[in-house]
Regions:
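Soluble metallo-hydrolase cores and metallopeptidase-like ectodomains found primarily
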Residues: 6-98, 114, 118-122
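Active-site alpha-helical elements of protease catalytic centers
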Residues: 100-114
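Structural recognition of the beta-strand scaffold that forms the well-ordered cores
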Residues: 32, 64-68, 78-82, 131-134, ...
Length: 287
C-alpha cells in the first residue's frame, strides 16, 4: 500500500486511517474533527465547528482512529493503547516516511489489537475493555490526543491507563552493543502499581533492559511531555511511554523501513502486549 503523504492535513492521511481500520479486524470508529492552518505551518483544533466556518480558508478535516475489544466482567474499565499515525509529510518534494516515527508504534498497536481480537475469538476475552487509538496530528502539537481527551468517547474516569507507543523500531547510540532494551517513561509518575507491574511482567516474559534515562524529571529532552500520553497524564491517568529513543534519522527523510530492527520491534511489541494483558485481567485497578 502506497501513500503520497502522511501529513495529518493531507487527504492521503484519511486513506491511511481507512487502512488501519481495515487491517485491525476489530470494531472501529473514526473520530473526525477539524483543524485550521494559520501562519503557514501552524495548526489549531476547531472545537466548535459549524457548517459555515468549516468552509473557511485553511480549514481541513482529520481523524483519530479507534478500535475496541470489549471486556467481560470489568468491561466498563478501559486500558488504552495508543500510537500516532501521522508524520511530517513532504518537504521540497521529498517524502518523509516516518518508518520509526511512528510507523513502528502504529504497527505494534495494530498487532496487539489483532492479538487481543484473536484471544477474544478463541474464548479468552480480557476482563477490562481495550481501547486502541491511532492519533492524528501528533507532529503538529499532539492535536489528536488533545482533541480526544476533551471529547472522549468514554468517560476519562473509566480509563485506568494509557500505554503509548512512539518510535520503538530502532537502536540508539547508547545501546549499540545491547539491542534488547526499551526506554520506559512515566510509569511511576502517577501510579506506583503500574511501575511495579511493568517491571514484573518484563522479568517474567521478555526480560528486556528497561532504561529509565528519559524518565528523570531533569532529562534535558523532556520526552515525558512530547508524545500523546501526556494528555492522559494531565488528566490524572497513569501512563507508560514506550520508545527506543532518538537517532540521526529522527524527522529526516532517511527514517525508512530498511533501518527498522524487526527482531527487537517484535520483542518490544510482545512486552507491551503482556503488560496490557496483565493490566486488563488483574483483580485490582492501579493505585
Amino acid at each position: 500500500m502506497l501513500f503520497r503523504s502522511n501529513h495529518f492535513a493531507n487527504n492521503e492521511i484519511l486513506k491511511i486511517a481507512n487502512w488501519i481500520n481495515d487491517s485491525t479486524q476489530i470494531y472501529s470508529y473514526f473520530q473526525k474533527f477539524y483543524v485550521k492552518e494559520y501562519y503557514g505551518s501552524q495548526f489549531s483544533t476547531m472545537y466548535n465547528p459549524t457548517a459555515e466556518n468549516i468552509k473557511s480558508k485553511g480549514v481541513m478535516p482529520t481523524e483519530n482512529v479507534l478500535g475496541l475489544v470489549e471486556g467481560t466482567d470489568k468491561k466498563e474499565e478501559f486500558v488504552v493503547i495508543s500510537a500516532h499515525y501521522d508524520h511530517i509529510g513532504t518537504k521540497n518534494g521529498t517524502i518523509y516516511n516516518g518508518a520509526d516515527d511512528d510507523g513502528s508504534g502504529t504497527v505494534a498497536m495494530m498487532e496487539i489489537a489483532q492479538a487481543f481480537a484473536k484471544a477474544k475469538k478463541e474464548g479468552h476475552s480480557p476482563r477490562r475493555s481495550i481501547l486502541f487509538i491511532a492519533f492524528t496530528g501528533e507532529e503538529q502539537g499532539l492535536l489528536g490526543s488533545s482533541y480526544y481527551v476533551q471529547n472522549p468517547l468514554i468517560p476519562l474516569k473509566n480509563i485506568i491507563c494509557d500505554l503509548n507507543i512512539d518510535m520503538i523500531g530502532r537502536i540508539d547510540r547508547e545501546h549499540k552493543k545491547m539491542h534488547d532494551y526499551v526506554y520506559l517513561i512515566g510509569a511511576d509518575r502517577i501510579s506506583k502499581d503500574l511501575h511495579k507491574l511493568s517491571e514484573n511482567i518484563n522479568l517474567s516474559t521478555l526480560n528486556l533492559k528497561l532504561d529509565y534515562t528519559y524518565n528523570a524529571e531533569s532529562d534535558p529532552l523532556q520526552l515525558y511531555y512530547r508524545s500523546d500520553h501526556i494528555n492522559f497524564a494531565s488528566n490524572g491517568i497513569p501512563i507508560i511511554f514506550y520508545t527506543s529513543g532518538l537517532h540521526p534519522d529522527y524527522h529526516e527523510s532517511t527514517d525508512d523501513l530498511e533501518k527498522i530492527d524487526f527482531d527487537i520491534l517484535q520483542k518490544r511489541t510482545q512486552l507491551i502486549f503482556h503488560t496490557a494483558w496483565e493490566i486488563a485481567n488483574r483483580e485490582e485497578g492501579l493505585k
